[in-house]
Structures are given as C-alpha cells and as structure tokens.
Amino acid sequence: MAERRMISKKVIYKNSFLDLSEGAIALYMFLIIEADDDGFVDGLRRIPRCPFATEENLSLLINSGYVIKFRSGVLLIAHWKKQNVVARDRYTPTEYKAEKAQVYIDDDGSYRRV
C-alpha cells in the first residue's frame, strides 16, 4: 500500500467544504491519511487518537457528500480518485470488496452509490 496521500485544492477549497466545522475538516484529513489505496477506511475506530473522530463530525461529512458510510461501518472518501493516484507497482486493492461493489466512479471522478 502506498504511504503518501494527496489532498486536492479543487476539493477542499469548495465553499461546501469550507462551510464544514473545523472538527469535520480535521476528521476528513485524518480519514485521508488512514484510507487504503482505494479510499476505504475501517470506520472511526481506525483513528482513535483524533479528537475530532466523532459521530457528529462524521455525519457532517456524510451529509455534505465527502464521505460514504456503509452498513458495515466502513467509510469511503467520496472524492478519493480526484485526489489520489497510486502507481501501479505500489497499489494494493482494497479488502472491502463487498463495499466497493456498491459504488461506481462517475464522470467527474467521484465515488457514487450504485
């Protein structure tokens, strides 16, 4: 799995992102750091040291379309493919295959539910 992550100004400089609380913005950054090469994170428990890892901040990210939450508790960074391209020789496919089967990548490079 790649160890570097990118954050795109095209995503984080949108008014809808800047209108989020500071806690939700910080949580988004932590989620990006913890995500696998396809943008999946094993829920909030994956980032226990982040003081902003609250259900309230997560709900803000979900309702704003920045994170997708699955029934399993797994999270997905909706704009992952817009921000991160992992070299083929460093890419490790996600272990969350059931969740990945529930989304597709739209024309603008964002994950959407099927």
Protein language model regions, located:
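Short acidic, hydrophobic short linear motifs in intrinsically disordered regions
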Residues: 35-52
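Winged-helix/helix-turn-helix nucleic-acid-interaction surface
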Residues: 1-11, 16, 51-114
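Short, amphipathic alpha-helical interface elements at domain boundaries
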Residues: 2-38
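Short, well-structured alpha-helical interface segments that form or flank functional binding sites
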Residues: 22-26, 42, 53-57
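Surface-exposed beta-strand edges and their flanking turn/coil or helix-capping segments
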Residues: 32, 42, 89-92
